A protein has these predicted regions:
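Metal-dependent de-N-acetylase/amidase catalytic core
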Residues: 123-177
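Conserved alpha-helical scaffold segments that buttress catalytic/binding sites
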Residues: 1-133, 137, 162-166
Length: 177
């Protein structure tokens, strides 16, 4: 995992991993980094989706992120964005990372084949703007990757994934990066 390498090499002192602001809890990242005090894992997800937390089956068990927020099935834009904003802004202020790694999963979208949240295209776009603007305005570098998203129509999926790139471009222009 690249975040561990960055910490071990001294490239950063503290790293925030927004591994999951999508429909699934970031259990794998939480497990890998659970003993690493210099890393903070944040997950805002649908509480009734994989991984389901079956104890006794380690490969399906939930590992706790440093901050886990499980949302109800069917959560829409307003509640989702409010949760993301509160958690992200609070964590940026309290943990004060040198770098944010953000996995911009789009399986929160209302038309996603496997998601259980109901986030509109506008809500998805606002999430990307919120995450990137929050980091850039605090002068915290952010690295974004696309992830999560299930649709039989590749064009629809690509359109959703493009939201994070549009938000990054807008921040680049706004802040003259």
């Amino acid at each position: 995992m690249r975040s561990k390498v960055l910490l071990e090499e001294g490239a950063v002192d503290r790293i925030l991993i927004c591994d999951d602001l999508d429909v699934h809890q970031g259990d794998g990242t939480a497990e890998i980094l659970r003993q690493e005090a210099r890393a903070f894992t944040l997950s805002v997800h649908c509480k009734d989706n994989f991984p389901f937390g079956f104890k006794g089956m380690a490969h399906l068990g939930k590992d706790r992120s440093d901050l886990d927020v499980g949302l109800e099935k069917g959560t829409g834009d307003e509640a989702f964005l409010s949760s993301v904003s509160e958690c992200l802004l609070g964590t940026l202020d309290d943990f004060r990372p040198d770098l944010v790694l953000y996995d911009a999963g789009v399986d929160v979208h209302e038309d996603d084949d496997l998601g259980n949240l109901c986030i509109s295209w506008e809500g998805l776009r606002k999430r990307e703007d919120l995450v990137i603007q929050a980091c850039v305005s605090k002068r915290i570098p952010i690295a974004c990757v696309i992830g999560g998203g299930y649709d039989r129509d590749a064009r629809h999926l690509a359109h959703r994934h493009a939201a994070v790139h549009r938000a990054a471009h807008d921040a680049w222009r706004t802040y003259r990066l």
